Amino acid sequence: MRSMNCTTNNTNNTGQNTKNSLGSSFNSSNYTSYRFQTCLTDQIISEAQTWSLSSLFNFSWVVSYFVMGASRMIFRYGWYLATLSLLRIPKWIFFKLHHVQFTLSFWLILFALAVIVFVTYTIMKERILSQYKRLTPEFLPLENTGKSGSSANINAASTQSANAPPAIGSSTTGASSIIDSKKHSLKDGNENETFLSSYLDQFLSAIKIFGYLEKPVFHDLTKNMKTQKMDEGEILLLDSTIGFAIVVEGTLQLYHEVDHSDKDHGDETDHSDTDGLDDQDRDEEDEEEDDDIDNYDTKSCSSNLIDEEDESVGYIHLKNGLGNFQLLNTVKPGNPLTSLVSILNLFTHSMSSYGNSNFPSELSSPIDTTVSVNNMFCSSEQNFSNTDSMTNSTNSFPTFPSSMPKLVARAATDCTIGIIPPQSFAKLTAKYPRSASHIIQMVLTKLYHVTFQTAHDYLGLTKEIMDIEVLLNKSIVYELPYYLKEAVIRKFKTVDKSSGSADLEPKPKNSNASSKLKKPPKAKPSDGIIQSLKIANANANTSSNSLSLKPEFTHHPSSRHVVLGSRDQFNPGDLLSNVPLSRTMDILSPNPIHNNNRNKSNGINTSTSNQHKRSSRSSSNNASVHSKKFSSLSPELRNAQLSTSPLSLDNTSVHDHIHPSPVHLKGRVSPRPNLLPTTSFSAAQEETEDSALRMALVEAMLTYLGVNKSNMSVSSSSIANMSSLNSPQLNEMYSRRPSNASFLMSPHCTPSDISVASSFASPQTQPTMLRILPKEYTISNKRHNKSKSQDKKKPRAYKEELTPNLDFEDVKKDFAQGIQLKFFKKGTTIVEQNARGKGLFYIISGKVNVTTNSSSSVVSSMSKPEQVSAQSSHKGENPHHTQHLLYSVGSGGIVGYLSSLIGYKSFVNIVAKSDVYVGFLSSATLERLFDKYFLIYLRISDSLTKLLSSRLLKLDHALEWVHLRASETLFSQGDSANGIYVVLNGRLRQLQQQSLSNSNTSSEEVETQNIILGELAQGESFGEVEVLTAMNRYSTIVAVRDSELARIPRTLFELLALEHPSIMIRVSRLVAKKIVGDRTVPALTGDPLSIKENDFTSLIPPTKASYSSSLSHKPQNITSGTITFRTITILPITSGLPVEAFAMKLVQAFKQVGRTTIGLNQRTTLTHLGRHAFDRLSKLKQSGYFAELEEMYQTVVYISDTPVKSNWTRTCIAQGDCILLLADARSPSAEIGEYEKLLLNSKTTARTELILLHPERYVEPGLTHKWLRYRPWVHSHHHIQFSLTGTTLMNEGKMHVLNNGALALMDKLIQTEFSRKTQQNISKLLPDSIKNTVENFSSRFMKSKRQYYTPVHRHKNDFLRLARILSGQAIGLVLGGGGARGISHLGVIQAIEEQGIPVDVIGGTSIGSFVGGLYAKDYDLVPIYGRVKKFAGRISSIWRMLTDLTWPVTSYTTGHEFNRGIWKTFGDTRIEDFWIQYYCNSTNITDSVQEIHSFGYAWRYIRASMSLAGLLPPLEENGSMLLDGGYVDNLPVTEMRARGCQTIFAVDVGSADDRTPMEYGDSLNGFWIIFNRWNPFSSHPNIPNMAEIQVRLGYVASVNALEKAKNTPGVVYVRPPIEEYATLDFSKFEEIYHVGVDYGRIFLQGLIDDDKMPYIPGSQETTLNSQVPEFLLHRRNSI
């Protein structure tokens, strides 16, 4: 169209141009050509567009045409086909069939039906009826387990599982990684470490014995430390001038002098005619003791100690007659050379060197070191000579005197020792006295635990230890005046003495004097008794001349008035005993005439006045110290026998020459009236008889403790020490240059290393002398100081807390307030052996016997008294001990000295020989006062070290204190046995590495596994067998938690065996008893030597394949065999769980099962620590407190009730032998909680058990597996019913973040209100029939809350069950196999429930595994009765068995119906979902082993345990074939015993074993066998056929195991009369059930009537009464 327009326009333009003039023709032509070109282009474009549009239209028209045609054709032909197939063809077929007839045979129809039924059944069986086949175990590699977890800590957790091996008798491959990775704690350090790191590690390891040290204290103690290198073979003389020596590198051998003086040791303990000690009442057994052994010549037998195979030298001989030395110990790096007593001497010598000691300095050292330093060693000029000038020739030896130290150390290799000089301890004592007292307290505790406790418990040297108190009583006799004794007796006569003992305690208020004593007033004591004691204490250190004076013996009259001291005149009422008198005391006048004049002036009778005067003078001058026996005393006082001290210089005895004790100088009285101070008393400060008595008792006890006025002033002593330390002489000695003491290291006079830095210098360089001036010498500009102080903040100075009024008078007042007067009747046991010491007793009047228990059992002395009493009380027996008299103590003596020093247990019994009156200071009072007046520890250590005999000193030098951290290895299997170990505190695990014989592995690659032999708790010993037999270690010892041990070196043991053969006999009995005990339970040890003959059960031990059924989970539900956990930690997985409420129930359950138990939370610990709760000493105080609690209680429960980052939570984890992880079983997620992560990071090897808390007694199938799947560090688990009402809402609020605040509250209110109203409306409107129908219909499709049956029987308390399991007192039920005869198990279980007998663990075989599994699942008889009956009906159905028949190649049946019957009973439940612990056994015919199943789907392993050969095919499990467990052990009692069950009820329903003897000759004819069976007149028994022989052959091992189970201790064997029933008589369910019920009732009632029923812990109504409640719930004050 556009082209036409262009043409028209062109024509019009042309006509118009023609009409125009011709002049414009040229322009018109140009314009026409342009327009023509434009129109032509537009025309071309228009034509192209028109063509494309027309083409598109044509294509769409063609497509629509074909689509419409095709659809029409499809519809037409589809309709035709539909009518053809639906109408025409059926119509044609109908008409055709209506006229056609055909015939099919019956067999063809039957065959077609059979094919259809077979196909249908196969489809149904594979799709619907075989759902149980999906419940197969999932096998995952152990290394991939951690990667599949949802938590980020799974890998760390899987690594941690290696640190937590399973229990006794089980094997693990993870534990080997620990032993390989852990460094041997007693070996040398790594060779790749530098010397500096090794030096620091060894040094820090050695000073652990000091406890915690503040940084300034540590700096002052170690800033003068030196190092000394020694070549191999050099000898170091160990005397008091060295200081504290530490082996840093190399090995040193410690030697003790062997001389003939040792043969006189027997006279040391021969205490005859001792004041305060009655030796006439000793038993004749004392004379038969080791006196002959003590006289044994050690030198003559020293050659017997040398082992030819031992590389170490037994003894050495020194030249020039310096003596022979016997090897005591080999000291390795990180251990100190200095003994505990020597450490105490370092502190006490520093004080005594400045005149603060009560004893002469020449007697201060317990080791005789009389060698002069100047004569013994080279001069100082030689010390500074060059090393090149040193020569090792014998000519260069110095000339030694005849006396040598008794201890020397010989360098076994090139070694380096670090030395802290004695001056450092002197400075430390002067500058930080409280820290010094803390160190002394720590060392005293170690001395008591390591030396004394080991000597008492293990070596039986109780007499040697108690000789300390004997010597103390001999050297100090402090007798009270007779009138004070009569005053005490008079007071107690008014008290009711029917109870056998009475006490008079101080009261703050006044009370009747006849019943209670008044509190002493805050006034200074009189000058009578008290001041004469001051004379004794003051004169003890004045001069040696006064020591030789004999005391003045005077007769004490029987007057009863209080001697208040000599005064100018007497006042009216002086004859009254308790009348307060006001007086002024002047200086005591020695002139008696002056006093007589005073008396006469007052008008008093001369005779009476003289009597008072003599009494006053005698009491003031002598203070009743070392007085004679009184002639005119009351009958109660005539038993007091006093004599002079046997250690006086006039009284020479054998003992004084052998073992001089400096404490005999104390208590001497030298009348020095001019030394008495002037003391005035006002009217308000009046003294009574009570106060005088208390002050006299206090001064008597302080005298025994070594405390007097001169050594109890912290200000004077500190000032004197600091002034003396700052003197030029001492500054020169303390300067950091080589002092004379530093060159006492080597007889070659080699230069010592000055410090750590100098040790790296060249040995040829000359030692540099360092001169250091004090900081006070610096005078600097004030501006400079201010600028520095502004730039850098001054560090806070460390200051110790000191008592402001630390005075001797204040000490006496505080002690007097805590003293008590007690009375004990004759025969009363005041303190029991191995019980905690009560305190310090001062005998006022009477006598006491100090005895020890002589038990027939060697281990009884090492066992806890609580355990003996608890076990004996269950059986109605009392432990009988024969008491052996050691010595007797009379009036004026003390008892309980050693146990009261640190408040530890008593080694002896203290029994009242007669009616005895004592003054008593309790342990709590002593601890409080010792902490307040800390200088007393210096005095105690000074006195104690000088009372030790040479034998105890030898033990102290040789015994080694070993500290192990958690997971640290003590020694490994195959190491040389160099000592015996005694566990002082903590817990150890004993592992043994065994090789697995596997035919698939090559000889070069031998698989090994670690078998746990047992665990060692406090008080147990190990290593005796290896030491006695000189063999290597047969096991590896790993610390479960932080532990302390005492090591008895092999050389010391051999030396003691020669000196004391009784020690060898004692240890031999102990080893024999251990071996016999191990052989009684060979399954616990796995020792092949313990297998008896014909014991086929022991030849089939469990292997690791038996536990591979649950994601390679280890056999961690096996509890400890005979292990009882001493400490238990309750730790939640996450916060918000009721830890404290759970712990309270568990502690109460422990008490109900007969265990003395205490629960510790943070409040309890803070209450005990007091003011040390938040300082640096809290850890030290805690460790001692926890060790003490383990001694007192059988079980200590640590309750982690603090946040995860608190120190108390870490302490609970570190202290637990068994850690209970609390978890809410209903929690939707089973992720690792924050507390659990802390547990994994702590690397503890303690046993970990998971506690799943359920509100009802029901476990959802698979719930436990969800918790255990990614927790391989969990050894076992328990299901506990515990209400979580209060904590559930809290947890739900934390989990559902959106529903918080008011929205959550409104949502809950709306839901509860609407649901309640809706239910009410429905119940009103709908009839009951419709409502029930709707509810029943909806319950099938809607998940509603189920109601579970919860039994209310008391004996089924879950906390009692947990307490019995953890304490090793579990009750086990073992059900044997026997087919249909096992239905009687139901009857026996019903009888057990009727008697109220709880069941904690269930095990079974065959039908016993089925019935036991049902009972373990629900723990009630009601729901399992119907299930067992239903299963019996299915098995007895003939049609079901016929449909399960197959071609009898392997078995007669396919096992499908049997599998389905078990699966329908247990469903998807796993064994770990059972409410109580359960196991079953099976026989692995592939590996020829017995397998124990405790994890996995219940139906599979119960089916495996019931797989009777021939009837059922073996169950395939990971390539192995499992058959009935009865072929190996039809009554698995051994496994139950290994799980820690003390009482086991074993029900045997197996067929009777036919033991009829056969007689048929050497050959046998089959026809004669048939004839013999049918011959009624034949006398020959029926010969078994081949099937019977095969059956008997299969049960050979089971028969021997059954006989062994019957003879196992603690097993109650039950066998109902079911012999007449066959194995497959399941149709006789009711009959067999009633047989079991009737027999069970009769059997159990017979046990009760015959008093043979075993003790059932927790069945009694009464619980143990404890003096300390399970919780000390104190409210903590705000900080």
UniProtKB/Swiss-Prot annotation:
Instruction: Provide the E.C. number(s) assigned to this enzyme.
Output: 3.1.1.5
Q: Which residues carry this modification: Phosphoserine?
A: S300, S312, S632, S634, S653, S661, S670, S680, S739
Q: From start to end residue, where is composition biased (Polar residues)?
A: 592-606, 630-652, 862-873
Q: How is its activity regulated?
A: Positively regulated by SEC14. Inhibited by organophosphorus esters in the order phenyl saligenin phosphate (PSP) > phenyldipentyl phosphinate (PDPP) = diisopropyl fluorophosphate (DFP) > and paraoxon (PXN).
Cytoplasmic-side stretches of the chain, per the record, are 1-49, 125-1679
What Pfam families does UniProt report for this protein, alphabetically?
Answer: cNMP_binding, NTE_Ploop, Patatin
Gene Ontology cellular component list: endoplasmic reticulum; endoplasmic reticulum membrane; lipid droplet
Q: Where is this motif: GXGXXG?
A: 1377-1382
- Known catalytic reactions: a 1-acyl-sn-glycero-3-phosphocholine + H2O = sn-glycerol 3-phosphocholine + a fatty acid + H(+); a 1,2-diacyl-sn-glycero-3-phosphocholine + 2 H2O = sn-glycerol 3-phosphocholine + 2 a carboxylate + 2 H(+)
Please list where the region (Disordered) is annotated.
1-21, 261-304, 498-527, 586-672, 775-800, 855-882
Q: Where is the composition biased (Low complexity)?
A: 1-20
Q: What class of enzyme is it?
A: hydrolase
Q: Annotated motif DGA/G: location in the chain?
A: 1524-1526
Any single biological process term in GO? phosphatidylcholine catabolic process
Q: Where is the composition biased (Acidic residues)?
A: 275-295
- Please give the residue positions where the record annotates the modification Phosphothreonine: T803
Q: Where does a nucleoside 3',5'-cyclic phosphate 2 bind?
A: 943-1074
Question: Its family?
Answer: Belongs to the NTE family.
- This one is known as Lysophospholipase NTE1
Organism this protein belongs to: Saccharomyces cerevisiae (strain ATCC 204508 / S288c)
